């Protein structure tokens, strides 16, 4: 169920987007976004674990400790369907590039590939010996990568559901896995304090990113252009790395993250922002370049575990843990 936030329209907001201003391609980057709450999506009965917008921008998928996946309208928050089949809670969900398939990672030690339109399970991926915590499709969507509490990263064939490679990736649970833009590389992160870059084809480790300190790495992903890596560590820090140089370029702080694996994002539809949830129940938005906190979104009543940025519009989805159980959709003019 989506509840809509109604706000009186001010004169200022009416006059902001004149045709001349929106068509002017050389306008300077916005200083700050103005995200406001539009919808609250209720339906999950336990903590929400992950939210992801479909690549075509139409849908939002959510996963939860309640063992369910739910699909919602990306623009209006309207509940579409529930997809069920896992025996235990789900930690992550991800879309195929054509927005037709989902993959989910569960505590039941399996991943499942789902046909979204029918809600049917097409394949169950078995092989991990402990909770599966994270998953993603490659851009071609013929492969899936997964990370588990069994400390391994696995690469799966989508068509057959067979495991193609098992990478002895880490010495602690794997917190995140992500393909780069052409699918040639995988990045993984772990509680062992390491981020590793893998060659998809050979399964070889090409690089290990190590900082002076090595707090658990709770999340990692490639930037949209594939040149950088955004990594979260459980010392209240997000870092932007140039991975080819193995160099940390930017550090983002002020949020709280010491316990949970909280997703972070690049927001590129308007200004260039970094977006993350936080253990103080807020969504934080930083200016990517200046590293300053430009907005904090208030409304959740528990840890904001997951955020997602819409592929084409200035829309953020956020999701929170057990004391909240809701998903919120926020929109901005820039």
UniProtKB/Swiss-Prot annotation:
Per the record, the domain of life is Eukaryota
- The principal localisation class reads nucleus
This chain belongs to the protein called WD repeat-containing protein 5
* GO CC list: histone acetyltransferase complex; MLL1 complex
Q: Reply yes or no: does the keyword Transcription regulation apply.
A: yes
Location in the cell reads:
Nucleus
* Record CDD domains: WD40
Keyword vocabulary terms for this entry:
Chromatin regulator, Nucleus, Repeat, Transcription, Transcription regulation, WD repeat
Q: How does it assemble?
A: Interacts with HCFC1. Probable component of complexes involved in histone modification such as the MLL1/MLL complex and the NSL complex.
Species assigned in the record: Xenopus tropicalis
List compositional bias (Basic and acidic residues) regions by residue number: 1-12
């Amino acid at each position: 169920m989506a509840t809509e936030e109604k706000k009186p329209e001010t004169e200022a907001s009416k006059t902001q987007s004149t045709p001349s201003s929106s068509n002017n391609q050389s306008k300077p980057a916005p200083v700050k976004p103005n995200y406001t709450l539009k919808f609250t999506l209720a339906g999950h009965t336990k903590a929400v674990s992950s939210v992801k917008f479909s690549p075509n921008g139409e849908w939002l998928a959510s996963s939860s400790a309640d063992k369910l996946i739910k699909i919602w309208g990306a623009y209006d928050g309207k509940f579409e369907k529930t997809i069920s089949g896992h025996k235990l809670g789900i930690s992550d969900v991800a879309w195929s590039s054509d927005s037709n398939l989902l993959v989910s990672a569960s505590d039941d030690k399996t991943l499942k590939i789902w046909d979204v339109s029918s809600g049917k399970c097409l394949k169950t991926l078995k092989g991990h010996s402990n909770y599966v915590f994270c998953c993603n499709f490659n851009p071609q969507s013929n492969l899936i990568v997964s990370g588990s509490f069994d400390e391994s990263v696995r690469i799966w064939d989508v068509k057959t559901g067979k495991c193609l490679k098992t990478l002895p990736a880490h010495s602690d649970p794997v917190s995140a896995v992500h393909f780069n833009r052409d699918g040639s590389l995988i990045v993984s992160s772990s509680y062992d304090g390491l981020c590793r870059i893998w060659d998809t084809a050979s399964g070889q480790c090409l690089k290990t990113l190590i900082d002076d300190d090595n707090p658990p790495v709770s999340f990692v992903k490639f930037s949209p252009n594939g040149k950088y890596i955004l990594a979260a560590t459980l010392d209240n820090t997000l870092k932007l790395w140039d991975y080819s140089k193995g160099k940390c370029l930017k550090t983002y702080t002020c949020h709280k993250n010491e316990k949970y694996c909280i997703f972070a994002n690049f927001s590129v539809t308007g200004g260039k922002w970094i977006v993350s949830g936080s253990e103080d129940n807020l969504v934080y938005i930083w200016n990517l370049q200046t590293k300053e906190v430009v907005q904090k979104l208030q409304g959740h009543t528990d840890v904001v575990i997951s955020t997602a940025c819409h592929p084409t519009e200035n829309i953020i989805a956020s999701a929170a843990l057990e004391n909240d159980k809701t998903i919120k959709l926020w929109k901005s003019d820039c």
